[in-house]
Amino acid sequence: WTTRGEWDIIELTNNKTRREGVDMNRQSIVIDRQYGSGGREVARILSEKLGMDFYDGNLLVLAGKEYGIDLGTLQTYDEKGVGSVLHDIALMSNTAYGSNINDAPFQAFNALSRLVQQLVAKGPCIFLGRCTSHILKTEARVPFVNAFIYASNMQDRIERARAVDGVEIGRIEAYIRRRDNQRKNYTRFFTDKAWGAPENYDLMLNTSTLGYEGAAQAILGVLEGRK
């Protein structure tokens, strides 16, 4: 496996070269995913096949540089960083103290939203999570394919979690559930949409049966059908 950090570096350095080969008439792709389902690998495969830029954690790095926002702040309110943070903020929303801190997560999200809109204005991209489907639909208003990647076999998720993040075997299932809940809470907080609900996606793809390549091919099939 290529580590998460390595892919962030690869994507940041390859943006310019990949953009040259992109078909500007293609639609963008948004992938939401269960933790450990291989959604990132599916996005990588699509990026290689289509020559389209692929954005995940590197969005935070780019947003921080573009808008002068501390990377730590962006990470605190990112889908990987939230736990009880957004829940606590929601509970304090009607208090005087809460009103002073409530702006922080929305400032972080608005920075990501502005960046996503800038990126798709230059051409179609591939995005992982972070409510980018909401941004593309309500703000950028560009066409896109929206897929949810899941794995019905927990063992598949466990093996990927160990390989990618090095999670200890004794706590791995609890870790997987926590990461899913973080993504669910992030989506609900910023969009009021249900993360993983079939009605919010064009495709629901099971990598335990399709594999990463099969899931990527299914998304390519939808793109081809929309030409």
Residue ranges and their predicted role:
Residues 9-10, 14, 20:
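Short, positively charged and aromatic/hydrophobic N-terminal segments
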Residues 25-29, 123:
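Pre-Walker A (Motif I) flank of P-loop NTPase domains
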Residues 31-44:
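Glycine-rich phosphate-binding P-loop
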Residues 53-64:
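Short beta-strand-centered segment that lines the nucleotide-binding/catalytic pocket of NTP-utilizing
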Residues 64-124:
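ATP-dependent small-molecule kinase phosphotransfer cores
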Residues 83-89, 168-213:
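Small-molecule kinase domains that catalyze NTP-dependent phosphoryl transfer to phosphate-bearing small molecules
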Residues 115-165:
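ATP-dependent NMP and nucleoside kinases share a basic, alpha-helical "lid"
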